Amino acid sequence: MKPKLLIAIFALAIAATGCMTHEAAGNMGEKLDISQFYLPNADASKVVSVSSTTNGPVGATVYIQTHAVAVKETGPKETVAKFGEVYAFSPGFVAVHKDEPTLIHFLNLQPDDNHDFMLYAPDQVFMKLLLPPLQDTAYVFTFHREGLFNILCAMHQPSMAGQILVLPPRPK
């Protein structure tokens, strides 16, 4: 990812206001600033609404795992020395349907590393949430706009990124 684009994404994330705070616990006693974690505000909910509970049937369920590609404990020393620890989302691409509630589980499989999840489009950051170690964090997403949305872990860039493609509604 280009540095200017990444800086713009972080600036949008910092500028987001009026969003709900995501409740999060620190990693192994580490104190976290949970004000950096939020769900879509009223304006963003016109594009994607997110709920921590299912208020009815979901159309699909998706599992996205954190994946350690090269880490200090088991990765090739040359790779870790040159690039640092490298992580990825698996799968890195998900397709969903417009206006169809989709339950997405985020499984952080690392016992000693926090990750986060940021959902954004070129014009706006919609949400950011913490993915604590060894936890399943689940939300119901309903996208109200077709198109391509980007996802990333801001803690592990540039490798930990992906996309969600919102397709037209399913035929009835």
PLM regions: where:
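Solvent-exposed coil/turn segments that connect beta secondary-structure elements
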Residues: 101, 107-111, 122-124, 144-146, ...
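Extracellular/periplasmic metallocenter environments
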Residues: 20-43, 56-73, 131-172
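Histidine- and aromatic-enriched segments that form or immediately flank copper-ligand environments
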Residues: 81-82, 105-135, 139, 161-163
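Sec-dependent N-terminal signal peptides
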Residues: 5-13
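C-terminal motif of bacterial Sec signal peptides marking the signal peptidase cleavage site
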Residues: 16-18
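Juxtadomain low-complexity/linker regions and immediately adjacent membrane-anchoring helices
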Residues: 43-47, 51
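N-terminal edge beta-strand
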Residues: 60-101
